[in-house]
Amino acid sequence: MAGIFKESVLTKKGIALLAKAQAGRCTIKLTKAAAGDGSYTSGEDLTTRTALKSQKQTFPLTTTTVQNATNVFVKFIMSNHQDSGDLKNGYYVKEIGIFATDPDEGEILYALAIAETDQWDYMPAFNDLLPSTIIIDFLLEVSNATDVTIQMPNKQYAYDDTTGKKYIIGIDNGLIYFQEVTE
């Protein structure tokens, strides 16, 4: 079953960054996504969060799609097999955060979404054979900001489930390349 998330919420620091961008003081630079298994109460004020309650992993942002003048979809791929280390213990994905760079404070939790109770996806530990992935489309408010930048790596990894081979897909000086990785 796919996880069902409530509407994302801008944190107070995210709202402050948005105000700076609307005033022309900065560009909103989205840096990464994170997932965790923190639990929240129904009346909890998510805007006061400065971090996930129980962060388990971080992920590079893959793409952004403008929905309208105030919202964008940010896409990222969650995986239990990453260059930064394989996931050792599985977890239920109960919280997802999007981070951004504030010119005055550094990296901040910009927005947060929590899953509906008992509607969580499960990210299993990596089994040393085939990775598990979850593709996330995250609706994000950028309300009237003149410029939004997505910080993402210039390469991504692809796994062939049939052969178990790993490939790098990337962009180098405007050219797209595809290369098998031997470990």
Regions found by a protein language model. Name each.
Residues 1-154:
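N-terminal assembly/attachment segments of tailed bacteriophage virion structural proteins
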Residues 157-183:
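A signal for long, low-complexity, Ser/Thr/Asn-enriched, surface-exposed stalk/shaft
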